[in-house]
Amino acid sequence: MVENSELRKAGLKVTLPRVKILQMLDSAEQRHMSAEDVYKALMESNEDVGLATVYRVLTQFEAAGLVVRHNFDGGHAVFELADGGHHDHMVDLDTNEVIEFTSPEIEALQHKIAEEHGFDLVD
């Protein structure tokens, strides 16, 4: 099972809650999910994982590099699987829809500005 190997590779013990949460994030139509979203989706699937466990596991996943945390909505944290590819986000403030995009022009401009100020971009 892919989830098991991903957890082991990240240095995490394979537990049922971790597997269920990783599966949920991987299969969800919504790419950016809050802990509450994950919890509700698990409940709708009749999975018995508590909200505190969801918060704890998402924090562990973030520390292990399996997910990335974003604070789009006034500090409200959402998580997405870390797929290794860099992309940026735009948020529609009326609908809270998150739009992902990549732009070589923006990336080049960021590197140019960083270089002009003597910085190296790390992310």
Swiss-Prot record:
Gene3D superfamilies in alphabetical order: 3.30.1490.190, Winged helix-like DNA-binding domain superfamily/Winged helix DNA-binding domain
InterPro entries recorded: FUR, Fur_C, WH-like_DNA-bd_sf, WH_DNA-bd_sf
Gene from which the chain derives: fur
Assigned keywords, A-Z: Cytoplasm, DNA-binding, Iron, Metal-binding, Repressor, Transcription, Transcription regulation, Zinc
GO biological process annotation, one example: negative regulation of siderophore biosynthetic process
GO (cellular component) term, any one: cytosol
Ranges where the record places region DNA-binding: 1-83
GO molecular function terms noted in the UniProt entry: DNA-binding transcription factor activity; transcription cis-regulatory region binding; zinc ion binding
Protein name, entry field: Ferric uptake regulation protein
